[in-house]
């Protein structure tokens, strides 16, 4: 196991003065646990909410670590955007990552995952599963990871001053160091915050038995320099009934990255050899400028949550000359996805037991390649091509040359109304959502369509600690824009078929919750069907004159989740399990639905467990947690998964188990200062996560140390 304990001890001594300084200046800080109420999901049971306090008591530096106790979520291998995620087996094509209610469903390239926010900047993370109710927002077919960023008011709670400074630092024995600072304050009705965090990670070592293409123990090109900051200014007025917040967040990854970030590098005979993977310096950036307003007691409107945002995803590569997906651009290459959106969410009380939720959502996305390259389109003639075939190729080239390409765009608009009524131990929910989309592909073609999506739910509380729930929700998701990196046109025109509709999910779910303060249990069973499943053209390597995005079949998924916890005194014990079985039924002649991880993955039944004890004096918690994934067989494609020779593959993902031990010490006896230690993957297990393909694995044994 790669655990340099002597370096850890040295770092502890080095930071001792920093602890004392923090204790002196922030002795009265008391951060409350953030309680999230009503995430606009109606009667849907929600699980696994990570609060600011829980985050501060962990060594997590990414969402994979922060959410590892949620069995329904699986993260792939690698670092940064090398990782894919699945939620109930469904991939990033239909799972959103929302930060301060800003989100985009466009991707840079199908060989890399979506950008996930730095947890150092957030105060709470929740998980929405399955198709959402009417108020869940645009495209809520398969759930979301929802994060809210921290602000000055959160950090000022409990202080006897109107300003403060927070410092944090961390060290990972498996080649990583992190540090950051936050400055925050309040003057009159105004408050502000600036927070900066850096996590500098070198190539990490995988588990015992792993060897890379050069015979070494490290995973090639897994190093990343992650830098993020958050700036916020807010004002509260009207006796606290009104609040306006303007924020800007930027999160950036820098490093030497491969063409296909989900893969590392294989030997010379491999399809992912060093020549095809062509590592180059790259920067991937996500920024969000957000203006938010919260108002209470506005006459008929009891509460209003509104925001407007500009979300940008940028990719910069120092040289893409060996990257065919990027058009083989020599020298610097820039790609950008810009999303502008607004949300207005109203709550009105019709009667003492009836709450009415209603609102509108708007989102416009635009992809901006560095240049359009359709003038360089070329179809290579086969070695024994006939004159007629060559003539056809030249004609197809002329078709592509004739197009005047423009930035592809998509606009989604939605409106909803939802009523929640309480009567005699029952909470009844009913809603209706209207969604409309308009897509313009880079050839100028436009397609639009609308859909109505009802939702129903009931919660029954027969006794004080029990409740049972059922929901039946419909949600739709518009066609995704084609990969931003490939909109240049050098490999042909990507259009959209006439009559293309939004795919539509129907999710039926039953569940229960029990919580008496000591023992708690919850569970759910779901069945989901998605009609008119969407797919972009999947053959991204060949030069074809014109290809189209289409509706191409349907998807079915079913599964269950169970969880239980026991708390008494300082003892906390938890256990959870999740199982899902997504299957894709492709009705298109060209079989466009794919087993690529952007669509989903058949993950094995996943178990999580943890046991911890917190002592009163000293205020110290020590614990263990485990994540165990059973073997998974079969493809998500109902017809089976074929290799490059057209033969059916026997898809098997091996099971694995990973154990961690952790500790949290509060030297001042409260949340003012946290000193965290964890030993992740104690037994140095070498394994491949189920949401990933081929060669990217996760870190082996790792000692992590952090304070905040």
Task: Kindly give the residue locations of the regions a language model identified.
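Conserved C-terminal beta-signal and adjacent last beta-strands/turns
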Residues: 9, 23, 227, 234-238, ...
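Signature of Gram-negative outer-membrane beta-barrel scaffolds
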Residues: 355-467, 478, 489, 576
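Acidic, small-polar-rich N-terminal luminal/periplasmic segments of exported/outer-membrane proteins
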Residues: 24-157, 261, 288, 510
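Outer-membrane beta-barrel signature, preferentially recognizing the C-terminal barrel domain
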Residues: 271-298, 335, 404, 408-410, ...
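Periplasmic-side early beta-strands and strand-to-turn transitions of outer-membrane beta-barrels
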Residues: 153, 160-163, 177, 182-281
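Gram-negative outer-membrane beta-barrel transporters
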Residues: 352-353, 422-428, 518-521, 525-530, ...
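Surface-exposed extracellular loop regions of Gram-negative outer-membrane beta-barrel proteins
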Residues: 252-254, 261, 265, 312-314, ...
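Flexible loop and strand-edge segments within Gram-negative outer membrane beta-barrel domains
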Residues: 240-302, 312-336
């Amino acid at each position: 196991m790669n655990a340099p304990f002597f370096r850890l001890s040295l770092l502890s001594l080095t930071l001792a003065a920093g602890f004392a300084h923090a204790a002196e200046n922030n002795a009265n800080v008391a951060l409350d646990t953030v309680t999230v109420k009503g995430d606009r999901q109606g009667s849907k049971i929600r699980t696994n909410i990570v609060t600011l306090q829980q985050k501060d008591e962990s060594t997590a530096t990414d969402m994979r670590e922060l959410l590892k106790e949620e069995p329904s979520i699986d993260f792939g291998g690698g670092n940064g955007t090398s990782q894919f995620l699945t939620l109930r087996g469904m991939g990033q094509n239909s799972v959103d990552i929302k930060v301060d209610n800003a989100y985009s469903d466009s991707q840079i390239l199908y060989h890399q995952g979506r950008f996930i926010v730095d947890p150092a900047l957030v105060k709470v993370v929740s998980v929405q599963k399955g198709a959402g109710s009417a108020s869940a927002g645009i495209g809520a077919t398969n759930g979301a990871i929802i994060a809210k960023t921290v602000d000055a008011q959160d950090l000022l709670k409990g202080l006897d001053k109107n300003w403060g400074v927070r410092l944090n630092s961390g060290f990972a024995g498996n080649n990583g160091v992190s540090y950051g600072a936050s400055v925050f304050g309040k003057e009159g009705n105004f408050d502000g915050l600036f927070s900066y965090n850096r996590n500098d990670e070198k190539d990490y070592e995988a588990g015992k038995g792993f060897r890379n293409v050069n015979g070494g123990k490290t995973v090639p090109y897994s190093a990343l320099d992650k830098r993020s900051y958050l700036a916020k200014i807010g004002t509260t007025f009207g006796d606290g009934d009104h609040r306006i917040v303007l924020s800007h967040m930027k999160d950036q990854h820098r490093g030497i990255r491969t063409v296909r970030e989900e893969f590392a590098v294989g030997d010379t005979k491999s399809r992912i050899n060093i020549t095809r993977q062509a590592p180059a310096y790259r920067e991937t950036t996500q920024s969000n400028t957000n203006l938010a307003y919260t108002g209470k007691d506005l006459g008929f409107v009891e509460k209003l949550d509104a925001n407007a945002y500009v979300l940008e995803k940028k990719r910069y590569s120092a040289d893409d000359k060996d990257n065919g997906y990027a058009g083989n651009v020599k020298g610097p290459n820039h790609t950008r996805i810009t999303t502008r959106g607004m949300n207005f969410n109203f709550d009105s009380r019709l009667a003492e037991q009836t709450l009415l939720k209603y609102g509108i959502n708007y989102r416009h996305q635009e992809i901006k390649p560095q240049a359009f390259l359709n003038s360089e389109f070329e179809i290579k003639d086969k070695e024994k091509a006939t004159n007629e075939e060559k003539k056809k190729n030249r004609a197809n080239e002329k078709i592509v040359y004739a197009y005047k390409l423009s930035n592809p765009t998509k606009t989604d608009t939605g409106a909803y109304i939802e009523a929640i009524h309480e009567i005699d131990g029952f909470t009844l929910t009913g809603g209706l959502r209207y969604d409309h989309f308009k897509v313009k592909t880079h050839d100028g073609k436009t397609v639009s369509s609308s859909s109505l999506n009802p939702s129903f739910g009931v919660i029954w509380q027969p006794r004080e600690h029990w409740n049972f729930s059922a929901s039946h929700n419909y949600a739709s998701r518009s066609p995704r824009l084609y990969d931003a990196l490939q909109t240049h046109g050098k490999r042909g025109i990507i259009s959209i078929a006439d009559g293309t509709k939004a795919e539509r999910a129907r999710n039926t779910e039953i569940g229960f919750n029990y919580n008496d303060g000591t023992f708690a249990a919850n569970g759910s069973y779901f069945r989901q069907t998605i009609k008119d499943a969407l797919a972009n053209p999947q053959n991204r390597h060949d030069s074809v004159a014109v290809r189209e995005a289409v509706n191409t079949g349907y998807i079915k998924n079913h599964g269950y989740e169970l969880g239980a916890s026991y708390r008494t005194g300082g003892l906390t014990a938890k256990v959870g399990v999740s199982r899902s079985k997504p299957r894709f039924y492709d009705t298109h002649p060209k079989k466009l639905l794919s087993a690529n991880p952007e669509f989903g993955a058949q993950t094995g039944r996943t178990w999580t467990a943890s046991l911890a004890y917190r002592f009163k004096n000293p205020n110290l918690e020590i614990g263990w947690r485990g994540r165990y994934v059973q073997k998974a067989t079969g493809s998500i494609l109902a017809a089976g998964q074929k290799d490059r020779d057209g033969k059916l593959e026997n898809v098997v993902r091996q099971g694995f188990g990973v154990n961690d031990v952790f500790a949290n010490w509060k030297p001042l006896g409260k949340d003012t200062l946290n000193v965290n230690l964890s030993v992740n993957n104690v037994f140095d297990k070498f394994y491949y996560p189920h949401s990933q393909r081929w060669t990217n694995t996760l870190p082996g044994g790792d000692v992590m140390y952090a304070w905040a």
